[in-house]
């Protein structure tokens, strides 16, 4: 039986529903959650001149190598300037295209699936609240863009495999698949396990696993290896990366099991979604939630192995799910998060394919359509959470009152708004919940400096430097606080150390040199 074509009317319905659910994002601002680092404070991406393109191709900015994503953002800037509407519009349109590609993927992988079932499956993917982070957050352009080429890679590969099975060459489809994979990796390197996913598809549903099928994966594997090296080099620049001494293999395995269960659970019950789910400062693998998740993952794995001959679809779906998530489960932990909604963007595709496969029955279709209505409402609500920095971090504090990152960011928002007392309270809440969180100590110190509490500021900067002795800005600011309290010798020491640590080409060096010169001149006049 032939697969259903994507007719214009069906495509239009899918696009309209997707755009409608994410429409609130068009009124959203850039948020204080990497958007500042990537857009408002980053002139390097603003344009497509040779110098801009050179930066995009070589930078590891923010711990990522994503030149193609930067190019699309540079194009957005060329059209929209710093108006966030254009950036959000591009994300939404890319996501809508991905929904159409998911329809095509379902049609390609599920024999005899109806157009209605494929459309519902595509919408279950597209308007699920777990997608909001990838779509409504301008920084995550890399998700929707790399996802587009990831889907095209798989679709072209399936076309190639079908052609080979029918005795046709299929070389163009194979070349297109490899090229799309390269583009996906240029947008974001999270697809490095795709060669293994294609091998799973060779086993089921394509049923063409062979030595030749293995050899076909060589170009994919070479691209994946190159991207993995670049991704690792980029992530090495992220200060929040945890070493094995800080987060051992047993702890990472527990985190991985938790992640595998988390995305399944949130797919079924997508409530209390957050921009940051904090990894404990010290993860205890014997804690009930980690033991329970490990047992559940083991049980699912054993079950799909036992029924692999009778239900090969179960083993294929579980394998693809695990493989797509493998790079973000914590084995190479970067950042303070234990899980993240955005990591589910591609990983949950196997489940929507399976759901679409059983929607031939009217009762199942009715349940799925009802679920779409609920998911659509939840997605609209979750998109509004990302409207601005204040709403984002108010929401996060509300659902997780111990989230020290949320307190820091809400405090920064309050500081920008002129609410210095509120900001000080948030910074204090952050350091109470994580005494090692030097960013919060630094922010509270800076707030104290602004409020004229120079002694308190110097004390908080000292705590910051005890945690991170190489924090140049903290050294300079402690020097200013000490200077204000007439501790000129201490101020001079701080300015000298800041200059020793600061890179030669760092723009603020001139300011620190001026601070040091001023202190030295004052000391000289006093004869000290």
Q: Where in this protein do the model-derived segments appear?
A:
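Polytopic membrane enzymes that build or remodel cell-surface glycoconjugates and lipids
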Residues: 1-425, 429-439, 443, 477
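Canonical positions in the second alpha-helix
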Residues: 396, 429-430, 463-464, 497-498
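Helix-start (N-cap) detector for alpha-helical repeat units in TPR-like alpha-solenoids
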Residues: 404-405, 438-439, 472-473, 506-510
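Register position in tetratricopeptide repeats
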Residues: 416, 450, 484, 515-518, ...
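TPR/TPR-like (Sel1-like) alpha-helical repeat modules
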Residues: 488-504
């Amino acid at each position: 039986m032939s697969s259903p074509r994507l007719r214009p009317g069906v495509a239009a319905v899918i696009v309209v529903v997707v755009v409608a659910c994410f429409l609130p994002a068009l009124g959203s601002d850039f948020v204080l959650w990497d958007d500042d680092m990537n857009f408002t404070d980053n002139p390097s991406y603003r344009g497509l001149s040779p110098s801009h393109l050179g930066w995009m191709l070589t930078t590891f900015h923010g711990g990522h190598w994503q030149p193609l994503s930067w190019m699309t953002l540079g194009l957005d800037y060329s059209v929209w300037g710093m108006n966030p509407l254009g950036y959000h519009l591009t994300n939404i349109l890319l996501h809508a295209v991905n929904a159409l590609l998911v329809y095509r993927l379902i049609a390609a992988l599920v024999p005899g699936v109806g157009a209605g079932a494929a459309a519902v499956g595509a919408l279950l993917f597209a308007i699920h609240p777990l997608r909001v982070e990838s779509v409504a957050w301008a920084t995550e352009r890399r998700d929707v863009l790399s996802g587009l080429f990831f889907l095209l890679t798989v679709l072209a590969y399936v076309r190639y495999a079908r052609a080979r099975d029918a005795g046709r060459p299929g070389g163009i489809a194979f070349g297109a698949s490899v090229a799309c994979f390269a583009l996906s990796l240029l947008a974001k390197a999270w697809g490095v396990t795709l060669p293994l996913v294609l091998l799973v598809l060779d086993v089921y549903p394509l049923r063409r696993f062979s030595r030749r099928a293995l050899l076909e994966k060589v170009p994919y594997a070479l691209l994946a290896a190159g991207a993995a090296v670049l991704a690792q080099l980029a992530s090495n620049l992220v200060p929040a990366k945890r070493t094995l001494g800080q987060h051992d293999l047993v702890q990472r395995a527990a985190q991985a099991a938790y992640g595998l269960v988390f995305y399944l659970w949130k797919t079924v019950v997508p409530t209390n979604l957050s921009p940051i789910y904090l990894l404990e400062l010290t993860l205890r693998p014997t804690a009930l939630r980690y033991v329970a998740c490990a047992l559940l993952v083991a049980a699912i794995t054993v079950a799909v192995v036992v029924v692999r001959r009778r239900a090969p679809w179960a083993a294929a779906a579980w394998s693809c799910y695990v493989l797509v998530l493998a790079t973000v489960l914590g084995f190479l932990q970067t950042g303070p998060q234990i899980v993240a909604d955005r990591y589910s963007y591609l990983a949950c595709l196997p489940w929507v394919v399976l759901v679409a496969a059983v929607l031939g029955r009217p009762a199942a279709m009715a349940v799925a359509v009802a679920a779409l209505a609920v998911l659509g409402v939840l997605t609209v609500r979750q998109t509004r959470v990302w409207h601005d920095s204040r709403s984002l971090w108010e929401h996060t504090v509300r659902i997780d009152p111990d989230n020290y990152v949320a307190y820091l960011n809400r405090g920064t928002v309050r500081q920008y708004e002129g609410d210095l007392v509120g900001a000080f309270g948030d910074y204090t809440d952050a350091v109470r919940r994580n005494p090692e969180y030097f960013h919060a100590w630094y922010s509270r110190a800076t707030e104290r400096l602004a409020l004229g509490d120079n002694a308190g500021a110097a004390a908080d900067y000292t705590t910051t430097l005890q945690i991170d002795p190489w924090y140049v800005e903290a050294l300079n600011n402690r020097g200013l606080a000490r200077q204000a309290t007439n501790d000129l010798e201490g101020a001079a020491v701080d300015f000298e150390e800041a200059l020793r640590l600061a890179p030669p080409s760092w723009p603020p060096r001139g300011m620190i040199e001026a601070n040091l010169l001023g202190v030295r001149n004052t000391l000289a006049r006093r004869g000290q």
